[in-house]
Amino acid sequence: MRIGSYQLRNRVLLAPMAGITDQPFRRLCAYYGAGLTFSEMMSTNPQVWHTEKSKLRLAHSEDLGLNAVQIAGSDPLEMAQAAAINVEYGAQIIDINMGCPAKKVNRKLAGSALLQFPDLVEKILREVVSAVNVPVTLKIRTGWDKSNRNCVQIGKIAEQCGIQALTVHGRTRACLFEGEAEYDNIKAVKQAIAIPVIANGDIDSARKAKFVLNYTGADAIMIGRAALGNPWLFQAVENLIEHNSISQMPSLKEKCGQILRHIQELHQFYGEQKGYRIARKHVAWYLQGIQPDSVFKQTFNAISDPKEQLIVLEDFFNLILDKKNVRTTT
């Protein structure tokens, strides 16, 4: 699949997720096969462009592949300025968020709230596309609510404005993340436009990914929540849809090693004052796939020292692997 002049390594993408798709997590997903990863959503408010938090969200390295940055806002000129600034910082793809269902985003008329105003959508897309010399993509939902599904209309507007690829999450804003993804509506969008369409929503296995690709005719799939605590999912999906082969999941030993490295990188990336707090939610997600009924989560969440976190986590993994007293962290 191509986005503008860029050939992606495969058709399996990691969704941009606020508070999750930082550099350490994107690196892990890319290692296991994500063909493209996106930064966390960046506000187009000029007051936050140069903050430390924004710099962390924009952090990128070559091993992550293409530098794709997602922006969110509602003012066309402000959106265009933000896109241009991000390109100056190294963004190779700009993604526009018109899919986020969060109230705090929608109250500012950003994210999926914009789907209620197709004329404003068009103004934003035209301004952003004309402001940068890199591909611009768009992420939407199927509409604001079930009575106002307009994803086909928005898709046509996007194509006319020069958007290079369109991601459709198969739910309305009103649905949030409840119910089942509307693959029929993603299929309708794909049939209505010529630009690449990326299917998103409820893709939690390699078989589901293959089904969604075949059913919708989409050019690629995007994985979001299913990757939490499960970055190796990309490996299984890539092998099935690109090579028609079923791959073995990484061994428990490999998973434990990767989790330890991920937590250590979070400590280094965010610093001692913040890294241990970010690590807690990731460990909780990882435990769901290793020992979902474990009380270890409470133990881990009570720790505020990064080094102690690593020691306790490795001891826990050693107990699971029956390798007691074999510690590599100090």
Curated annotation (Swiss-Prot):
GO molecular function: flavin adenine dinucleotide binding; FMN binding; tRNA binding; tRNA dihydrouridine synthase activity
Record EC number: 1.3.1.-
Record: residues binding FMN: 16-18, 70, 139, 200-202, 224-225
Protein name (Swiss-Prot/TrEMBL): tRNA-dihydrouridine synthase B
Cofactor: FMN
Source organism (scientific name): Haemophilus influenzae (strain ATCC 51907 / DSM 11121 / KW20 / Rd)
Function, as annotated: Catalyzes the synthesis of 5,6-dihydrouridine (D), a modified base found in the D-loop of most tRNAs, via the reduction of the C5-C6 double bond in target uridines.
Broadest EC class assigned to this enzyme: oxidoreductase
Active-site residues, Swiss-Prot/TrEMBL: 100
Upper classification of the organism: Bacteria, Pseudomonadati, Pseudomonadota, Gammaproteobacteria, Pasteurellales
InterPro entries cross-referenced by the UniProt entry: Aldolase_TIM (IPR013785), DUS-like_FMN-bd (IPR035587), DUS_fam (IPR001269), DusB (IPR032887), DusB-like (IPR004652), tRNA-dHydroUridine_Synthase_C (IPR024036), tRNA_hU_synthase_CS (IPR018517)
Protein family per UniProt: Belongs to the Dus family. DusB subfamily.
Recorded catalytic activity of this chain's protein: a 5,6-dihydrouridine in tRNA + NAD(+) = a uridine in tRNA + NADH + H(+); a 5,6-dihydrouridine in tRNA + NADP(+) = a uridine in tRNA + NADPH + H(+)
Keywords assigned by UniProt, alphabetized: Flavoprotein, FMN, NADP, Oxidoreductase, RNA-binding, tRNA processing, tRNA-binding
Domain of life: Bacteria
Gene: dusB
